[in-house]
Amino acid sequence: MDGTTAPVTKSGAAKLVKRNFLEALKSNDFGKLKAILIQRQIDVDTVFEVEDENMVLASYKQGYWLPSYKLKSSWATGLHLSVLFGHVECLLVLLDHNATINCRPNGKTPLHVACEMANVDCVKILCDRGAKLNCYSLSGHTALHFCTTPSSILCAKQLVWRGANVNMKTNNQDEETPLHTAAHFGLSELVAFYVEHGAIVDSVNAHMETPLAIAAYWALRFKEQEYSTEHHLVCRMLLDYKAEVNARDDDFKSPLHKAAWNCDHVLMHMMLEAGAEANLMDINGCAAIQYVLKVTSVRPAAQPEICYQLLLNHGAARIYPPQFHKVIQACHSCPKAIEVVVNAYEHIRWNTKWRRAIPDDDLEKYWDFYHSLFTVCCNSPRTLMHLSRCAIRRTLHNRCHRAIPLLSLPLSLKKYLLLEPEGIIY
C-alpha cells in the first residue's frame, strides 16, 4: 500500500471538475473555462450553490416563507455567476458553448442579474444573444423592474431601445409598471426616458396608485427623516407630463394625502399649485389637513406651519373648533403651527383641554406665545384687524394664495392676510 494513491472515484472526479469550473468563473480564467467545456468534462448549464446574502441571484414568490439560512445561498449557472462577477469574457465563452440564456435556477435569468448589478456590457451581450426582454422572475418582475439605481439607468435604456415593454406590470400582488419603480426610487432621468418612450403617466398599480402618488409617498426617507429632492424632481416632472394630481387610490387617498402624511410642504405646495383639491377625503373621511395633524409630532424635519398655511390658503376646511385641543397636542412644541391654525378662525374660545395638552416644559419655553394664545382666545372678540382679515379670506376662500399677492397692499399686510406666523397672537 505504501507509495500508492487512492483511486479517484467517478463522483470525486466530477466534484473536482465542478470546483475547477467554479474557480475559473470566479477568477475570470476564460481560457481554462473554455478548455473544460471543449473537453466536455461538465455540462455548460451546471447549477452551483453559492453564497448570496444580498439575494442578487435569487427571487422568490411573494408570501413564501423560508428560514434565514436558506436565504444566504442561491443556485446559479455559470451565466449567472459571470454576470454577477462582471466577467464578460467568461460570459461570451459560455454563450459560445450554447449555455441556456433564460435559465432560472433560483428565480432570475442572467438578464435580471445583469440589471440588478447594473452591468450594461452584460446586458448588451445577453440581448444580442437572444435573452427574453420581458421575461418574469419568480417574484414577478421583468428586467426593467430590476433597474432601481442611477447606475442601472443605462441598462434600462438598452432594454427599451431593444423593445422591452415600458408598460408591463409586475406579475405579483403589486402590479407595478417600470414607471412606478422609477418613481419609487426617485430616478428622474429614467422617468423622463420611460415617458418619452410611451410609458402611461397615470398607470395604476394593484392599489390604484399612480407613479405620482408613489413618488410623493417615498419622498420622505423614513429612517433618516429627510426629504428627497430627487423624488421632488420626479413629482415636478410627472405633473409637467400632465399626471392627474387628484387621482385616488383604493383608499381614496390623493397624492396630496401622501405628501401631507409626510408633512412635506414642498410637495404640498407643488400639488396645490397644480390644482390639487385641499378638501378631498379618504375612505375614513380625512382630508389632507387631518393627515398633517396626525403626523406633526413624528416629523422632526418638517415645517408644519407651512403645511397648514398652504392648505388653509387653498381653501381647506378648518379643524372642528371643539377638537382644537388636538392641534395643540400635535403642535405644542411648534407654536407657529398653532398660530397659523388659530388665526383661521374669527374667534375661538379656549377650554381646559387646551391647557392639559401643553407639557409644562413647553409652556415655560414658549410662555410668551401661550400667554398671548390664552389671552386672545377668551370671551372677548378679536381685534378689528383680525376680523377684517377673516372677512377678506372668507370672500376669497380657495383663491387666497392667488388673489392676496395681487392686492395693492404693503407686503407686511399681505403676509398677515396669508396667515404668516409672527410668534405671538394679538
From Swiss-Prot:
The SOCS box domain mediates the interaction with the Elongin BC complex, an adapter module in different E3 ubiquitin-protein ligase complexes. InterPro entries: Ankyrin_rpt, Ankyrin_rpt-contain_sf, SOCS_box, SOCS_box-like_dom_sf. GO terms for cellular component: Cul2-RING ubiquitin ligase complex; Cul5-RING ubiquitin ligase complex; cytosol. Keywords: ANK repeat, Cytoplasm, Hydroxylation, Repeat, Ubl conjugation pathway. It is found in: Cytoplasm. Interacts with HIF1AN. Component of an ECS (Elongin BC-CUL2/5-SOCS-box protein) E3 ubiquitin-protein ligase complex formed of CUL2 or CUL5, Elongin BC (ELOB and ELOC), RBX1 and ASB4. Interacts with IRS4. Interacts with ID2. Pathway: Protein modification; protein ubiquitination. This is Ankyrin repeat and SOCS box protein 4. Hydroxylation at Asn-246 by HIF1AN may provide an oxygen-dependent regulation mechanism for the function of ASB4 in promoting vascular differentiation. The modification (3S)-3-hydroxyasparagine is found at N246. Belongs to the ankyrin SOCS box (ASB) family. ANK repeats lie at residues 74-103, 106-135, 139-168, 174-203, 207-247, 251-280. Residues 238-239, 244-246 are annotated as: Essential for interaction with HIF1AN. Residues 371-423 form the SOCS box domain. CDD domains: SOCS_ASB4_ASB18. The record marks L256 as: Essential for interaction with HIF1AN. Probable substrate-recognition component of a SCF-like ECS (Elongin-Cullin-SOCS-box protein) E3 ubiquitin-protein ligase complex which mediates the ubiquitination and subsequent proteasomal degradation of target proteins. Promotes differentiation and maturation of the vascular lineage by an oxygen-dependent mechanism. Also acts as a negative regulator of GPS1, a component of the COP9 signalosome (CSN) multiprotein complex, thereby inhibiting the serine phosphorylation of IRS1. It comes from the Eukaryota. GO terms for biological process: intracellular signal transduction; positive regulation of vasculogenesis; protein autoubiquitination. The lineage of its organism: Eukaryota, Metazoa, Chordata, Craniata, Vertebrata. It holds the Pfam family SOCS_box. Its main location: cytoplasm. One of its GO terms (molecular function) is ubiquitin protein ligase activity.
